[in-house]
Amino acid sequence: MLAIATLHVALQVFGAFSLSHAAAVTLEHRSAGNSNIAAIPAKWDVYGYLFNVTVGSPPQNITMLSDMTWMAPFVRSGRCLSQFNPELCVAQGQSFFNEHDSTTFGNTTFAQATWPVTAFAPNFTVDYGRDKFCIGNICNKDILMQVSDFPYPGSVVPVIPFGGIFGLAPTPKTITETSEPVNFQAWKNGNMGPLVGWHTCEVLKSAASCQGGDAQLVFGGTDTTMYSAKKIQSYEIQNPEWLSDAFYPSTPPRSNYWTVVDEGSEGLGAPLSLNGYKYLVRHIKSAKLASKAIVQNIQQQGSSGYNTANQDWYTVSCDGLDEFPNLVYQLDGRKKYTISPGDYVTKLTDMPGSVCYLNVNVWKYGRTENGDARVVLLGKAFLKRKYLVLNFEERSFGLAPLLTG
């Protein structure tokens, strides 16, 4: 590397980034072969990682989007405009959960909830119901879930390749039932451990651990073959008030983010402040503003779009990456993590010739007037060489180097 080829992103992150240091946390790691642990393959889609569950009795197969900022599980239903009418409420080709076909579904007395702004639909309105919910071979009765009841016909919402959202956000300090993810409810009922493990197979020599998918989620424990427990660094989550609407405006304000980890559905690229991005571009001689056609192609690579800032995109040479800077992230004043050029320079595979671009995410919420950032979003580019452990009991998460084989 060149002498200047290190861009040090000195962030007090995951204290959201407060100056206080997160306390060390002891995690209980259990093998993915345990009977109350489910290891599930997930496929990458432009929306994020998708995996399958079953809901109801008899079981209905539902493809879920993994979302580390969502809370209680959500399913598309045959409801809209306060009525059950699948012909009106579900667009042709859209998968959904049919509550009338389940003998175990029940409504609840929880009030209807609406989020005016989401990446999926405007005025995102849900009712709450309960039903049997299975992750792999682990089934839980009476799981509280969100059931769509949008204030418009189903034709208004574009067809998407999943029928639900699997929330993986930590519970807030003051826990309410409507804020509990499926796995938290299962742990509370003694059917599953409090941990969730995650890794992608993108950089592995063998993708066997992902079971035919692009990533693996382990509910109730972790895959201890993919990392060394001795090398895990843990962080307690800390959510200041100003972070409460980091993803979407929310009433009441949110205080339960993994401050801030997201597996890719909100930002694929290496996270930088605007100033950091400009610095990076200045130190890469081949960087050129991308054409409109290339920008359109880049945007089709993935991301929900809501939290992606209006930023310039740059093409760079696909060669000579050893002259590009490393990106070094220091979390909470402690552990430093590095993203090498090979992980933030991405080649567009569906364009003629050899076209590479800087896959950098200047998060919308992270922008400030002076170009610095109080918060960055650690997405896929950061996590693909890490094993991620979410601890719902301790409200903490851990990172360890992924054993690539």
From Swiss-Prot:
Entry-linked InterPro entries: Aspartic_peptidase_A1, PEPTIDASE_A1, Peptidase_aspartic_dom_sf
Cysteine pairs bridged by disulfides in the record: 318-356
A Pfam family recorded for this sequence: Asp
Main subcellular location of this protein, as a coarse class: secreted
Keywords tagged on the record: Aspartyl protease, Disulfide bond, Glycoprotein, Hydrolase, Protease, Secreted, Signal
Lineage: Eukaryota, Fungi, Dikarya, Ascomycota, Pezizomycotina
Domain Peptidase A1 per the UniProt entry, residue ranges: 49-400
Naturally occurring in which organism (per UniProt): Gibberella fujikuroi (strain CBS 195.34 / IMI 58289 / NRRL A-6831)
Protein name (database record): Secreted aspartic protease FUS4
Family indicated by similarity: Belongs to the peptidase A1 family.
